[in-house]
Amino acid sequence: MVQLELKKDQIMKNKIIEALMYFQGDQGLSPEQVKEVFDLEKDQEGKKLLNDFMEFYNAREGGTKVFVFGEIYKIATIEPLKDYVSKLVSIVRYQKLSKAAIEVAGIVAYKQPITKSMINEIRGVASDQVVNTLLVKNLIEEVGISPTPGKPVLYGITNKFYDYFKIKSLQELPNLSEFDFVQSIDEEQEEEQSYEGFNLFSSQREN
């Protein structure tokens, strides 16, 4: 019975770490962050949980594995699949932006330099995939590293951002407070929503 309880406890910890790692995206997860989440006393305890999770996760025959970069643990695509990922990148580059991507682009424009966790906090939902899409389309870029714990990447907009949305300055964008940070709005609402005469959703260039 005790062994069963211990197994359930480890399974739950693995689930939590997987969720945290997914939320962090390419920023990864550090032993210090795990220590804080689980209310542990030492970073070494957080590192052990991460190593246990990595052993569990990498034992499966999946398309992703946990890799360690210094002290940061990340879930990433395995090497044999990189060509398929590259094909998807080329497809995404020529697709128009979703409402979620437009929202994130607006947040980066107004709050730059900004970390992914700050974007998540503003929107109230994880934005990792959206940020990756904007990076692929070269609308945002990495502009530095934050000195905060975990040293997350800072993002800012690129010159292509202005061309993509047909604007000359950020003053032409709607106020940040007027964005609706809910990803589940219907397509009809996306097309109808405009701000002070400027419709950010219809301002995209045909790419």
UniProtKB/Swiss-Prot annotation:
Gene3D superfamilies: Winged helix-like DNA-binding domain superfamily/Winged helix DNA-binding domain. InterPro entries: ScpB_csome_segregation, WH-like_DNA-bd_sf, WH_DNA-bd_sf. It is found in: Cytoplasm. GO terms for biological process: cell division; chromosome separation; DNA replication. It comes from the Bacteria. Its main location: cytoplasm. GO terms for cellular component: cytoplasm. Keywords: Cell cycle, Cell division, Chromosome partition, Cytoplasm. Homodimer. Homodimerization may be required to stabilize the binding of ScpA to the Smc head domains. Component of a cohesin-like complex composed of ScpA, ScpB and the Smc homodimer, in which ScpA and ScpB bind to the head domain of Smc. The presence of the three proteins is required for the association of the complex with DNA. Belongs to the ScpB family. NCBIfam families: SMC-Scp complex subunit ScpB. Participates in chromosomal partition during cell division. May act via the formation of a condensin-like complex containing Smc and ScpA that pull DNA away from mid-cell into both cell halves. This is Segregation and condensation protein B. The lineage of its organism: Bacteria, Bacillati, Mycoplasmatota, Mycoplasmoidales, Metamycoplasmataceae.
